[in-house]
């Protein structure tokens, strides 16, 4: 099998090491790096196919990356220019899907909503930017999302938009859900049984929202659809060192980054294809 060159290995390592970016942003970053790689290295077809295969397997909990790369692979030929165009086209489709989701969600929001979110979804941030551009009054409650603290980057982005944001620890989700009008999260993978995978803590947030009678909207484009058996999906575990656990022979720190969230707790799924009611949608 063709050995990966140093540039390809670096690209693969960067994808594996990024534990801060959301699925969409990580996919876009990877596609941008692929464009540079194709343009500057002009790899042989076998090398590029192997790189795509290894990239697809690198982040199993973020199916959007694997789906985007699979779509590129379907269009490949021996011509580097064809590969470049395929990457650019898929990148545009992914970026446009995020914008469409934001517009779909915007039309459904109540007046002056208080929105609670967890982690730092690109789709959720796109919605917030859209709301700010439309000068719609709203405020946000966001978790800091430990151990990566990507909620801090979301809080900074909202601050730059002059949007009021309350930053809380993940442990305070149950306290603050009653103060929100609705909960909105992103999604890393939408499973065939309707459950979805997202940053750990999302399941607890969904349970808190359900208990408080607050709707849970999931922003999930079609790139996140997975046909895999839900029971076989790998939930990525990151280095335990991120937890800064005390040393001890009887201490075992665990750092599982993603979890499944039951379909029954979801009120709406909003994708670029439309708005889909789910089991937790309030009956009228």
Question: What feature does the model see in each segment?
Answer:
Residues 1-87:
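Long amphipathic alpha-helical segments
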Residues 73-111, 124, 129, 136-183:
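Ligand-binding beta-strand-loop-alpha-helix segment within the catalytic cores
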Residues 24, 114-124, 147:
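Gly/Ser/Thr-rich loops at beta-strand to alpha-helix junctions
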């Amino acid at each position: 099998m063709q050995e990966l060159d140093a540039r390809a290995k670096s690209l693969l390592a960067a994808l594996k090491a990024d534990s801060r970016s959301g699925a969409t942003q990580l996919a876009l970053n990877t596609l941008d790096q692929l464009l540079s790689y194709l343009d500057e290295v002009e790899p042989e077809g076998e090398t590029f196919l192997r790189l795509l295969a290894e990239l697809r397997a690198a982040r199993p909990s973020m199916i959007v990356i694997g789906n985007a790369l699979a779509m590129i692979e379907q269009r490949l030929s021996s011509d580097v220019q064809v590969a470049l165009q395929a990457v650019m086209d898929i990148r545009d489709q992914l970026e446009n899907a995020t914008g469409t989701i934001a517009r779909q969600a915007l039309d459904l929001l109540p007046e002056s909503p208080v929105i609670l979110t967890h982690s730092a979804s690109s789709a959720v941030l796109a919605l917030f930017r859209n709301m700010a551009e439309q000068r719609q009054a709203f405020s946000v409650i966001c978790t800091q999302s430990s151990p990566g603290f990507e909620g801090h980057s979301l809080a900074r982005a909202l601050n730059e938009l002059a949007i009021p944001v309350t930053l809380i620890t993940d442990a305070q989700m149950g306290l603050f859900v009653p103060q929100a009008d609705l909960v909105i999260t992103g999604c890393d993978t939408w499973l065939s049984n309707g459950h979805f995978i997202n940053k750990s803590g999302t399941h607890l947030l969904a349970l808190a929202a359900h208990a408080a009678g607050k709707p849970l909207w999931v922003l999930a484009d079609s790139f996140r659809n997975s046909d895999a058996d839900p029971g076989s999906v790998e939930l990525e575990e990151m280095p335990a060192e991120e937890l800064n656990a005390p040393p001890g022979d009887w201490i075992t720190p665990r750092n599982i980054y993603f979890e499944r969230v039951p379909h029954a707790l979801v009120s709406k799924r909003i994708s670029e294809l439309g708005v889909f009611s789910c089991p937790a949608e309030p009956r009228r």
